[in-house]
Amino acid sequence: MLHIVNKSPLERPSLDACLRIAEPGAILLIEDAVYAAARGSAAAARLAEAGKRHKVYVLLPDAEARAIADRLIEGVATVDYGGFVDLVAEHRNCQSWL
C-alpha cells in the first residue's frame, strides 16, 4: 500500500498515526509533510526508524519549494511528479493521511 501524507508533523498527527499503524509498504511525503524528512526535524528520527519497515519517498518539487531538498535524511528517496504517478500505479491501494 502507498501511504500519502501531506500535513506537517508540527501541524497534525497524521504522520505519527501513519507510522504507528500502517502495514509495511511505501510512504510518500508531499506538501508540508516533506518537513518531516529534513535533518534535525522533530520527526526525522521517527521517520528514519520507519525506513526499516517502509520505503520512504519525498516529492522533490515540494522539498525544493521549501528549501530543504539538500537537507533530507539518509534513506529517503526523492521522486518528481512522474515518479508520484508511478508510485500510485505500482501500488494496488493508496491511503491519504489527512
Show which residues each predicted segment covers.
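Short, conserved loop/helix-junction motifs that constitute active-site signature segments
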Residues: 19-23, 45-53
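N-terminal beta-loop-helix "entrance" segment that forms/cooperates
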Residues: 33-49, 68
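C-terminal structural segments of small proteins and small subunits
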Residues: 66-98
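Structural motif corresponding to alpha-helix initiation and N-cap regions
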Residues: 12, 40-44, 78-81
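Short internal beta-strands
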Residues: 25-31, 54-62
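Histidine-anchored nucleotide/phosphate-binding helix
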Residues: 10-24
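Short, glycine-rich nucleotide/cofactor-binding loops
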Residues: 1-14, 32-40
